[in-house]
Amino acid sequence: GLKAFLNEDYDNLLCVDLICHGVPSPGVWKRYLKEQFGSNKVISMQFRNKTRGINDVTLDYTLTNGSVFHEHYKESSYIQGFINNYYVRPSCFECKFKGINRCSDITIGDFWSLKEFHPEMLNQYGVSSVIIHSKKGERWFKESLDQLVYCVAKTEEIAIWNESLI
């Protein structure tokens, strides 16, 4: 959309998109919060707190009454339903931005299958993937190498646990 609006390619504009699992129903989220916290309102929310590492990810809620609640990912019925596509919007399954061929310069997202292909790169907080789609994206990546710890991976390896790339 931005590229079409600008109607020209700017050298200093890097277009980045994210690997998206989909968007859950806001109604399901509201019902979940009401079920969890009743009349207490959530004033702050962190969906993926990795402070204790990738194997102990929590959803962190701060409520208006000052209490803080940590819910482990594996124990969250909301997260399990989202991961299993129980309430991802139907339009997400028809999204024209899914797939490998993207109009961005780079795509970034979680590298869930890293352990299977590049176990030497594992760390306790998780690893992101960068998929390069353009010469500009390649140039940016090369200019950033001194700030990155990286390995070369095949797009197919990244796509295994990122179904929206398929």
Residue ranges and their predicted role:
Residues 5-18:
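A short alpha->loop->secondary-structure connector
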Residues 18-21, 50:
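An acidic- and aromatic-residue-enriched active-site/binding cleft used to recognize and process polar
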Residues 22-32, 119:
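Short, charged, surface-exposed secondary-structure boundary motifs
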Residues 40-166:
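Long, compositionally biased charged/polar accessory segments in the mid-to-C-terminal portions
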Residues 4-8, 30-31, 145:
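Short, glycine/charged-enriched secondary-structure capping and boundary segments
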Residues 21-22, 133:
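Short beta->alpha junction loops/turns
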